[in-house]
Regions:
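Short amphipathic alpha-helical interface segments
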Residues: 1-28
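Conserved core of the sugar-phosphate nucleotidyltransferase
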Residues: 8, 20, 173-249
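A short, conserved structural fragment
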Residues: 43-52
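N-terminal nucleotide-binding beta1-loop-alpha1 segment
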Residues: 53-86
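Conserved beta-loop-beta/alpha segment of the NTase-like Rossmann-fold superfamily
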Residues: 125-202
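Juxta-kinase regulatory segment immediately upstream of eukaryotic protein kinase catalytic domains
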Residues: 276, 287-320
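Active-site catalytic-loop/activation-segment of kinase and kinase-like phosphoryl-transfer enzymes
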Residues: 284, 290, 408, 424-448
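ATP-binding pocket architecture of kinase catalytic cores
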Residues: 320-425, 446
Length: 448
């Protein structure tokens, strides 16, 4: 089995065409002295001839390090990327003229990696065309809404060997993929100053990862793709088998599982220069990278906001996802110094809400002065635009002042004589909700 120096030198000769000692040093990153000594060893092993051409035995020596395949994770919602991710997955967005996931697939194929699996979940149909366009394998993660990305790993666990693990929304300015890799690694870039990202602690010349800390300063941070060698894949699979059914495992990133078992899962840090790897956690991040994106992206949500507020897309700033909704997706934003909130109807919300009655009730509450935040709701599609009001404190049923204010509003509403088409029948409504929940198998409490 080749050591790291032998691998780097032989790979430079075999795959990069290096034919002089200086070329080997430059292509492998080894010092000239180390390259010279390593070349002598390769000759002694019969892996290169006197002209530094690889022999037939070189391919056999490199075989254990050949990349088997790649997995692209594309199942998640990416809620921080509101509002664009409410309409389509980040991976299918067009950035600087290319669809993100398509660019990544092309880069993998340019490196000779043709066995590519895309794991989908949220808006999965958006990715199905990739089967015909690129011949990739599509795997559906049916647990994407209830578990973190460890469920994506579970879906492809049987495929993992010497495998690249990628995210569909990464953008690489240079192709980072190679057909042969020596050992498992996590790509990283250096963050100057304070950072809230996952910071790596390494040891030794090979930069073996010995610790992971969330947040730090002037540190190498986890960013971009990962490579798992066969030993790592097998070890991680055993750990995932043991922990997967534990409810505490469901919300964990696979990286959290790795960090908890770091001594059992050797992996090195692969440093990249600043500007090679891009991840877009928010719309603002992407706008910084591609200034034309916001004007070119196909977004009904942005069009709704612009039409209702009489603004341009460039006027929309400070987008912050709101997590209070049970079924809907909402975000707050700012236009010309004023804050607003937009509600995007979630999947299945129509089963619980009659939009026509909701619009009528909202309009009455606005006219009576009970809700001055309301601006507009679309009775067909269910999206709603409101003025954003920051809550000073949440309603507390044990607070007499809170209850008095709520009941005063209720008396105003009932005394108004206003009528909507829908009558309230708590028992009938509860039965219909129960039927909808049962159909989706969402009731999991034994004593319900």
């Amino acid at each position: 089995m080749l050591g790291s120096y032998e691998f780097e030198a032989l790979y430079a000769i075999y795959a990069k065409g290096a034919r002089t000692q200086r070329a080997v040093a430059a292509a492998s990153g080894l010092s000239l002295g180390t390259a010279n000594a390593t070349i002598k060893a390769l000759r002694a092993f019969g892996l290169v001839d006197d002209s530094l051409a690889p022999t037939d035995a070189a391919l056999d020596a490199l075989a254990p390090f050949k990349v088997d395949n790649a997995v692209i994770m594309a199942a998640g919602l990416s809620s921080r990327f509101a509002p664009i991710s409410y309409e389509k997955p980040k991976g299918v967005l067009r950035v600087r003229g290319e669809v993100l996931i398509e660019r990544q697939i092309r880069q993998l194929r340019e490196a000779g990696i043709d066995d590519i699996t895309v794991v989908v979940g949220y808006k999965k149909e958006e990715f199905f065309y990739l089967e015909d366009l690129f011949g990739v394998r599509i795997v559906i993660n049916h647990e994407y809404a209830t578990r973190n990305n460890n469920s994506t790993i579970r879906c492809v666990q049987h495929l993992l060997g010497n495998t690249y693990i990628c995210s569909s929304d990464d953008y690489f300015t240079e192709n980072p993929f190679e057909p042969y890799v020596f050992r498992a690694y996590y790509s990283a870039t250096f963050a100057s100053g304070p950072t809230e990202e996952w910071c790596l602690v390494t040891k030794g010349k090979e930069r073996l990862i010995s610790g992971v800390e969330v947040g730090g300063r002037d540190s190498w941070i986890m960013l971009g793709h990962v490579y798992w060698d066969r030993a790592f894949s097998q070890a991680f699979g055993r750990i995932l088998d043991a922990e997967y059914d534990d409810p505490a495992c469901a919300p964990r990133l696979w990286e959290e599982i790795y960090a908890a078992h770091i001594d059992e899962l050797p992996m090195v840090m692969h440093p990249y220069e600043d500007g090679v790897i891009w991840e877009f956690d928010s719309l603002a991040d992407l706008q910084e990278f591609d200034s034309d994106f916001i004007d070119n992206v196909d977004s009904a949500i942005m069009d709704h906001v612009c039409r209702m507020l009489g603004c341009a897309r460039s006027d929309i700033h400070g987008i912050v996802p709101l997590k209070q909704g049970l079924t809907n997706l909402s975000f707050a934003f700012e236009v010309k110094g004023r804050r607003y909130a937009y509600r995007h109807p979630g999947v299945g919300s129509d089963a619980f809400i009659r939009r026509s009655a909701e619009v009528a009730a909202e309009s009455i509450a606005y006219e009576l002065g009970l809700d001055r935040s309301f601006i507009f709701e679309d009775v067909t599609d269910g999206w709603k635009l409101s003025r954003f009001i920051a809550a000073r404190e949440p309603f507390d049923g044990r607070n007499v002042a809170h209850v008095d204010a709520a009941m005063a509003a209720a008396r105003t509403l009932h005394a108004s004589g206003a009528v909507v088409e829908r009558s309230a029948d708590p028992l009938k409504d509860a039965e219909s909700y129960l039927e909808a929940l049962s159909a989706d198998r969402r009731i999991s409490f034994r004593d319900f």
